[in-house]
């Protein structure tokens, strides 16, 4: 849910949509969706599981709570059923959360890293982090895991 500033709430609907697009862009999932569709088509005509590519698997927390300035350890297990090499990337899904500042994790290319809640975050704010895993199979497959961090008092 996007929280619009009061100055935008009273604008006509089209202006509100333009504001959202400019300030809260949606991630572009087009290529991963198309690759997922292509892989599923291949599954339907491939009799052996091992002859097709499958998406990575991510295991770890879905939600955490922490105070402003507190450092959280992010420990996730990321595997690929086909034993393909994986690329890991953490990123902030700004438009899903209520905290509007930019955040980063200590090592965005590692499934095991840390994150410090910004000092200016308010209790009740939510920060949505996405752990994205991409394999090097054909077609490339992605898995997304959302972590919702709620800022505590």
Please place each PLM-identified region on the residue numbering.
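Short, solvent-exposed loop/linker segments at the N-terminal edge
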Residues: 64-72
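Extracellular acidic, Ser/Thr/Pro-rich low-complexity tracts
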Residues: 77-82, 94-95, 135
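Extracellular and select intracellular beta-sandwich modules with Ser/Thr-enriched
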Residues: 140-147
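A post-motif C-terminal structural segment
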Residues: 1-48
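Low-complexity "stalk/linker" and mucin-like segments enriched in Ser/Thr/Pro/Ala/Gly
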Residues: 58-60, 92-120
């Amino acid at each position: 849910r996007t929280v619009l500033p009061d100055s935008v709430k009273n604008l006509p609907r089209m202006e509100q949509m333009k504001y959202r697009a400019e300030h809260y862009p949606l991630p572009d999932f087009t290529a991963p969706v198309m690759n997922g569709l292509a892989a599923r088509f291949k599954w339907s005509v491939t009799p052996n599981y091992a002859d097709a590519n499958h998406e990575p698997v991510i295991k770890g927390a879905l939600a955490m709570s922490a105070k402003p300035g507190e450092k959280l350890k992010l420990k996730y297990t990321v595997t690929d059923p086909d034993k393909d090499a994986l690329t890991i990337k953490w990123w902030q899904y700004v438009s899903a959360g209520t905290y509007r500042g930019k955040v980063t994790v200590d090592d965005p290319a590692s499934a095991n890293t840390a994150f410090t809640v910004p000092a200016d975050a308010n209790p009740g704010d939510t920060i949505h982090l996405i752990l994205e895993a991409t394999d090097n199979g054909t077609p490339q497959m992605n898995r997304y895991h959302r972590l919702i961090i709620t800022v505590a008092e």
